[in-house]
Design a protein with these regions (language model features):
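A generic alpha-helix signature
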Residues: 1-5, 9, 34, 58
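Basic, amphipathic alpha-helical hairpins
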Residues: 2, 9-23, 43, 47, ...
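Terminal helix-turn-helix DNA-binding modules in bacterial transcription factors
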Residues: 12, 45-83, 106-118
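Basic/polar phosphate-binding segments, predominantly the helix-turn-helix DNA-binding elements
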Residues: 26-54, 77-102
């Protein structure tokens, strides 16, 4: 398997499985039958981004689409692969600079009910 091909397969696998909360370097290591340190180092060499950061970015792209719909934050967090609402809120703010509710307000939708101060 060529290196470029393995990278593309990893990207495709992440995109297809972003909603799985257990998706991480160990899951990719197991799926592609490669040691976790290799998977982590190889992905960063090919993409320029840490694997965990890349998974977060893929998930957040899906989150941003869902925020423009009427889904509750708790539902979005679970369906986009975050293990908890708390981690979802922390990661979203870390990457986007605003809370999910603020993002929604800036982009035209308002959250019905949620507590972001968890």
């Amino acid at each position: 398997m060529k290196k470029g091909r393995l990278y593309l397969e990893m990207r495709d696998y992440i995109e297809a499985n972003y909603s799985d909360a257990t998706l991480n370097v160990n899951a990719l290591s197991e799926h592609f039958e490669r040691p976790a340190p290799f998977v982590s180092r190889y992905f960063k060499e090919m993409n320029g981004t840490n694997l965990t950061q890349y998974i977060h970015k893929v998930r957040l792209e899906h989150v941003k689409e869902k925020l423009l719909q009427d889904e509750k934050l708790e539902t979005i967090a679970v369906t986009c692969g975050f293990g908890s609402l708390r981690s979802f809120l922390r990661i979203f703010k870390q990457y986007e600079g605003v809370t999910p509710t603020q993002y929604r307000e800036l982009h035209g939708k308002k959250e019905e009910t949620t507590n972001e101060n968890i």
